[in-house]
Amino acid sequence: NGIAVTFHRAIDMCRDAFEAIEDIAELGCNRILTSGLASSAYIGADMLRHMQIAAGKRMIIIAAGGVNAENATDIISRSGCMEIHASARQKVSSGMLFRRDSVSMGAKDVDEYSRLSTNINEVRSIVEAISNVPY
């Protein structure tokens, strides 16, 4: 009865998602963030629907993984999920002015001078795309 708790995507790696739903409900979580055991929520939309039915009114199933403006409405209508999660991210250049390209702070194939950031236009596009979805 305190703060709401969302169980993150670990359920997508479970042997039995429906058994996991029961365990997660028993633990008192309010939501489960999941792609429906698939590589994306779009691919897992049918499983998301089954998971939502299994969770019933005990928990909210949040569709996550590859959600964007082009597929959000379809994911919602196919899965029955009324909440979605999207990273809406884009790669942006680092603000570093001096760059020593001969040194790497990690793996050599990692771009040291960029980062991922939320793309406000993608967020707006997703919100606009789902604005007419009936509840």
Model-derived features with residue positions:
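C-terminal helical cap(s) of enzyme catalytic domains, especially alpha/beta-barrels
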Residues: A45-A54, D74-S79, S93-Y135
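Glycine-rich phosphate-binding active-site loops on the catalytic face of alpha/beta enzymes
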Residues: C29-Y42, S79-R100
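Generic recognition of short, well-ordered alpha-helical segments
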Residues: F18-E19, I43-D46
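Catalytic beta/alpha-barrel core
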Residues: A4-C14, N30-A41, I62-A64
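Glycine-centered loop/turn motif at secondary-structure junctions
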Residues: N1-G2, G28, P134
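Catalytic cores of alpha/beta
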Residues: D12-L27, M51-A63, V67-A86, S102
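Mobile, glycine- and charge-enriched loop segments
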Residues: N1-F7, R49, I53-K57
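A polyampholytic, Gly/Pro-enriched intrinsically disordered region
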Residues: E26-R31, K108-D109
